[in-house]
Curated annotation (Swiss-Prot):
The gene is ubiD. Transmembrane segments: none annotated. It is found in: Cell membrane. It comes from Bordetella petrii (strain ATCC BAA-461 / DSM 12804 / CCUG 43448). It comes from the Bacteria. Gene3D superfamilies: Single helix bin, UbiD C-terminal domain-like. This is 3-octaprenyl-4-hydroxybenzoate carboxy-lyase.
Length: 514
């Protein structure tokens, strides 16, 4: 599917029956979550709440939800016609991350053309007077309560900004980083920026604090960017390529960007809403001293304004514990005329992150095969909270091969740093079929011999099951057939009917009345 911006994408969804406009008044407080959750579980359409009720009154803009509620809509957002076509996207990313040696002159010319297209032809295009700056709120007009920010769950501490595309640049970086991080409003012009320590935005911020201590760190947050740009921020794009360039490759046209009004950051020109501002040093007059509740740990000494975030309902299906994160002070809000506010919720799978994980499986397979060619297929079950459990099938070649694959998966992509469980099966097992996977685990695996346990590894801080916040264990399960050296026993022979018998039964089947 080809499109220019979010509005164009929504128009095409509506023509395909994949967008439902809702004129009934619906509250941003809990009601939208319940409706979106029911529709997503039924694999229903994207939802545009045209009469959103926020803080007791009609909101000034509609709310878009469930945009990526099915794998097919994710594929359309990435410029593909079907989910299976995302394998081609993965092949492209694999080539950009680690190009193979050309097999001849024609192949070499093709690779040069592909790299030229990725690195030059799809470089972002800077435009003047971008649509995202048609309306500007500054000074006293900056009030986050004017945006219909959703309150997702009864135990949430506050509304939650969810689909914000956070734009940062480190002091030594040639390109900007784009990431999706949730944000908690704590004042009319302040949000808590909840990014995990290994994410690109957090890395850029730490580099800035080291290189320019005591100076504000510029940040922009785009809401309602085009789907290719949004999805580029959650895809393992190589460090040599910006998410804007990757979005251009997906879309088939260069990403148009405009310069933020208060910094040199480039923002999506067709985004619906953009928040501009800074992370402020703790001694800045605009910074607010942290409030430490009784019994809570003190904030880390970062030299910057910090606040205690949460609790919120998360993709695990539980409320997460509180933790300290930097505060984003919003200097201005820019937007298009008649903007659309893009929102989502996270909860017990399936939710939108889980659906994204299902679609991105197809992207991951070629990337993983480039490092581990023995991989046949790879699957992140949505009920595994997007990334916490992986099943991988391999062409086993030697004793201990499954264990090598486990450690390779934990290392090859940052996305799998927090994967707690990896199940390795042979290539006769479909990793996407739980009946087959469970059969392999229960027949080909000894719990003691074939289980790998690793202690004190990086883990998602939202994982309350880990003994220490941010550090926890990992388990690998070798559910492959065992080779000499792995067992001294005679291995089981699979049961199978003779082909001749099958053919005779096929011939008589129509006479059996079955």
């Amino acid at each position: 599917m080809k499109y220019r911006d979010l509005r164009d994408f929504l128009q095409q969804l509506e023509l395909r029956g994949e967008l439902k406009r809702i004129a009934t008044p619906v509250s941003t407080h809990l009601e939208m979550t319940e409706i979106a959750d029911r529709v997503l579980r039924a694999q229903g359409p994207a939802l545009l709440f045209e009469h959103a009720v926020h803080n007791g009154a009609r909101a000034a803009m509609p709310v878009l939800a469930n945009l990526f509620g099915t794998p097919r809509r994710v594929a359309w957002g990435m410029g593909a016609d079907e989910v299976s076509a995302l394998r081609d996207t993965g092949e492209l990313l694999a080539s950009l991350r680690e190009p193979e040696a050309p097999r001849g002159l024609r192949d070499a010319l093709g690779k040069v053309a592909m790299l030229k297209s990725a690195l030059w032809d799809m470089a972002p295009k800077r435009v003047r007077g971008p649509a995202c700056q048609e309306i500007v709120w500054e000074g006293a007009d900056v009030d986050l309560a004017r945006l219909p920010i959703q309150t997702c769950w009864p135990g949430d501490v506050a509304p939650l900004l969810t689909w914000g595309l956070v734009i940062t640049r480190g002091p030594n970086a040639r390109r900007q980083n784009l990431g999706i991080y949730r944000q908690q409003p704590i004042a009319p012009n302040k949000l808590i920026m909840r990014w995990l320590s290994h994410r690109g935005g957090a890395l850029d911020f730490r580099e800035h604090a080291r290189a320019h201590p005591g100076t504000p760190f510029p940040v922009a947050v785009a809401l309602g960017a085009d789907p290719a740009t949004i999805l580029g921020a959650v895809t393992p794009v190589p460090d040599s390529l910006s998410e804007y360039q990757f979005a251009g490759l997906l879309r088939g046209s260069r990403t148009e960007v405009g310069q933020a009004l208060g910094s040199d950051l480039s923002v999506p020109a067709w985004a619906e809403i953009v928040l501009e501002g800074h992370l402020l040093p703790a001694n800045d007059p605009r910074a607010v001293a942290p409030v430490v509740p009784e019994g809570a740990p003190p904030p880390p000494d970062t030299g910057y304004e910090m606040a205690l975030e949460g609790p919120y309902g998360d993709h695990t299906g539980y409320y997460n514990e509180q933790d300290w994160f930097p505060v984003f002070t919003v200097d201005r809000i820019t937007m298009r005329r008649d903007p659309v506010y893009h929102s989502t919720y996270t909860g017990k799978p399936p939710d939108e992150p889980a659906v994204l994980g299902v679609a991105l499986n197809e992207v991951f397979v070629p990337l993983l095969r480039r490092q581990l060619p023995e991989i046949v297929d790879f699957y992140l079950p949505p009920e595994g909270c997007s990334y916490r459990l992986a099943v991988v099938s391999i062409r086993k070649q030697y004793a201990g091969h499954a264990k090598r694959v486990m450690f390779g998966l934990w290392s090859v992509l940052r996305q799998f740093m927090y994967t707690k469980f990896i199940v390795v099966v042979d290539d006769d097992i479909d990793p996407r079929n739980w009946n087959e996977v469970v059969w392999a685990i229960t027949t080909r695996m000894d719990p003691v011999r074939d289980t790998v346990l690793v202690e004190r590894t990086p883990i998602d801080y939202l994982d309350f099951a880990s003994p220490v916040s941010g550090l926890g264990g990992k388990m690998g399960m070798d559910a492959t057939n065992k080779w000499p050296g792995e067992t001294d026993r005679e291995w089981g022979r699979p049961i199978a009917m003779d082909d001749a018998v099958k053919q005779r039964v096929d011939a008589m089947w129509g006479e059996l009345g079955l």
